[in-house]
Amino acid sequence: MAEGGGGARRRAPALLEAARARYESLHISDDVFGESGPDSGGNPFYSTSAASRSSSAASSDDEREPPGPPGAAPPPPRAPDAQEPEEDEAGAGWSAALRDRPPPRFEDTGGPTRKMPPSASAVDFFQLFVPDNVLKNMVVQTNMYAKKFQERFGSDGAWVEVTLTEMKAFLGYMISTSISHCESVLSIWSGGFYSNRSLALVMSQARFEKILKYFHVVAFRSSQTTHGLYKVQPFLDSLQNSFDSAFRPSQTQVLHEPLIDEDPVFIATCTERELRKRKKRKFSLWVRQCSSTGFIIQIYVHLKEGGGPDGLDALKNKPQLHSMVARSLCRNAAGKNYIIFTGPSITSLTLFEEFEKQGIYCCGLLRARKSDCTGLPLSMLTNPATPPARGQYQIKMKGNMSLICWYNKGHFRFLTNAYSPVQQGVIIKRKSGEIPCPLAVEAFAAHLSYICRYDDKYSKYFISHKPNKTWQQVFWFAISIAINNAYILYKMSDAYHVKRYSRAQFGERLVRELLGLEDASPTH
């Protein structure tokens, strides 16, 4: 098929429309935060920049060029089969004879489970996940910790027990750093560039620092507790329950690590000494995310218990760690016919077959150096001496499982039991026109590209306060995720049609409502 020719370019818009029809469930798409990036153009399938996570989401063993946007195309020619030990692979159940199979049946209607009134405010959506009873528990635990701390280390004459109103204001100050990124939340009272007089008048800096000193979600370890995150685990459990009850995900979902690295604005203003003093994160945060809306369905925190050989760094690229993470993230997904997209570190035949028995279907990118390739035919994992033409591919099938080797300036391998191997798709490239591919490759590119775009935008709204204690880091990341989820529910509600807030405006409104500077509607 011609690459970059005029005919291909003329056909591309129609092919793109056909692809959009297949992926119309990505209904929030590029406007997920009420704003458009420099590379949006109304197409949710292109990455926003060359540095986008989508470049790593579909890296090949030869060249790191991701699949582009999907579309529809006539059946392409397939790459000629290389000489291979056919008998061994046939004995293992793998065959080049392909058969059509229907997609996993899914009849559930995804979206919010509760209809919010048009008058609902930002804090109403936030409190779907962090309600008053959770905040009241923080008040109790913080006061308990302050009392025990002073019994042990001496009285603090400046301390007065915190109230629910003050706890909301405390959260509001912290959340404000997700909108106005600054080195320290104390900049609000500084009188400098990041100062905010209207916020500073609600609470004195001295009072804020006292609450920050004693703030706790769980004040004391119980005798049975051994988990390193015991100080935040009850909050994570409560948050998970609220995610489950507030939203029904679409059929297609993604397992991945969201962008939670250091804020680039902060790094740019740091001295080299300050950067050296900052401790490396001691945990890994994984999520299961709805690929139609960006709603994060489930959070999993893997704590690095120590620096020994069993620590997180030692297991960073090992399949057993990532398989454990995937099982934990999908423990509530059994029997629902979800389609889960995975990266190379999770993709494995053993895991996918295990999930299929539970009614969970998968489509994952495969890399020989990062994936568990046990049980896969060696001939499909070895690159031929002469590269095939762009868009050619080979497929072998075992039961419902298809192993795809597709060429696009590099070999890309996919393992899936969610898509028929005989169904055709197409990747649309701006300069090259359409590139034929199996439907599984097209679907992977569409959904992963959407999540990468979402990631690029929502990571800008993480709370930039960086505490040294691991449980506090996890807590503020979880709060940030809850706010982003709240905004998604807001965009899918009638309230969005009354006042169309962007993500930044929604965050600003939430801060002012928590600090009591704006009236919130009485929907709770």
From Swiss-Prot:
Outcome, altering residue 272 to A: No effect on DNA transposase activity
Outcome reported for the amino acid change (mutating residue 519 to A): No effect on DNA transposase activity
A Pfam match: DDE_Tnp_1_7
Sites of Phosphoserine modification: 521
InterPro entries: PGBD (IPR029526), PGBD5 (IPR042423)
Primary location class: nucleus
Gene Ontology molecular function: endonuclease activity; transposase activity
Skewed-composition ranges (Pro residues): 67-79
Compositionally skewed regions (Basic and acidic residues) per UniProt: 98-108
UniProt-listed GO biological process terms: non-replicative DNA transposition
Region Disordered, residue ranges: 30-117
GO cellular component terms given for this protein: nucleoplasm; nucleus
EC number: 3.1.-.-
Reported disease: Induces site-specific DNA rearrangements, including intrachromosomal deletions, as well as inversions, duplications and translocations, in rhabdoid tumors that share developmental origin with cells that normally express PGBD5, even though these tumors may not exhibit apparent widespread genomic instability. This activity recurrently targets regulatory elements and tumor suppressor genes and promotes cell transformation.
PANTHER family per record: PIGGYBAC TRANSPOSABLE ELEMENT-DERIVED PROTEIN 5 (PTHR28576:SF2)
Note: Has been domesticated very early in vertebrate evolution, approximately 500 million years ago, in the common ancestor of cephalochordates and vertebrates.
Listed name of the protein: PiggyBac transposable element-derived protein 5
Lineage: Eukaryota, Metazoa, Chordata, Craniata, Vertebrata
Gene behind this protein: PGBD5
